[in-house]
A protein has these predicted regions:
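NAD(P)-dependent short-chain dehydrogenase/reductase
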Residues: 77, 83-128
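Conserved sequence/active-site signature of Rossmann-fold short-chain dehydrogenase/reductase
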Residues: 6, 71, 111-113
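Short loop/turn elements that form and flank the Walker-type P-loop nucleotide-binding site
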Residues: 16-17, 59-60, 99, 127-128
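Conserved Rossmann-fold NAD(P)-dependent oxidoreductase catalytic core, especially the SDR/UDP-sugar
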Residues: 23, 27-87, 91-93, 101-103
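Conserved Rossmann-fold cofactor-binding substructure of NAD(P)-dependent oxidoreductases
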Residues: 1-20
Length: 128
């Protein structure tokens, strides 16, 4: 869907009749987030809570939260937001009442050709 995870009502309507939700919405530019922490919290944490609640309201079978390796021992606001996002997703498995929704997380590492990827660095080192 194209929309804003901060808009709970629209998110809830978008999830009607969905079996699986892949939650990849996030502000991800580390430099931008450091100067806009409140916006990152609204999108990356509160938006995740909206995804959880809308999924439960619609009896979605499975929710997959796309996280990052930056959530491990976070050193910046982006990593901290993803760390919290993972925790509330996992916690939702224990605080969902009678719902059968399964919440899980996946972490990606370095995406080829993305800004900040270490893959080009390793390729250059291998060529040397």
């Amino acid at each position: 869907m194209i929309g804003d995870v901060r808009d709970y009502e629209r998110l809830k309507r978008a999830m009607q009749n969905c079996d699986i939700v892949i939650h990849a919405a996030a502000l991800k530019r580390v430099d931008m987030i450091e100067y806009n922490v409140a916006e990152a919290i609204k999108t990356n944490i509160m938006g995740t809570l909206n995804v959880i609640n809308a999924s439960l309201a619609n009896n979605v079978k499975k929710v997959i939260f796309v996280s990052t390796d930056k959530a491990c021992s976070p050193i910046n606001s982006y990593g901290a937001c993803k760390f919290v996002g993972e925790r509330i997703i996992i916690e939702s498995n224990f605080n969902k009442g009678l719902s059968k929704t399964i919440f899980s997380c996946v972490r990606y590492g370095n995406v080829i050709s993305s800004t900040g990827s270490v893959i080009p660095f390793f390729i250059d080192k291998l060529k040397a």
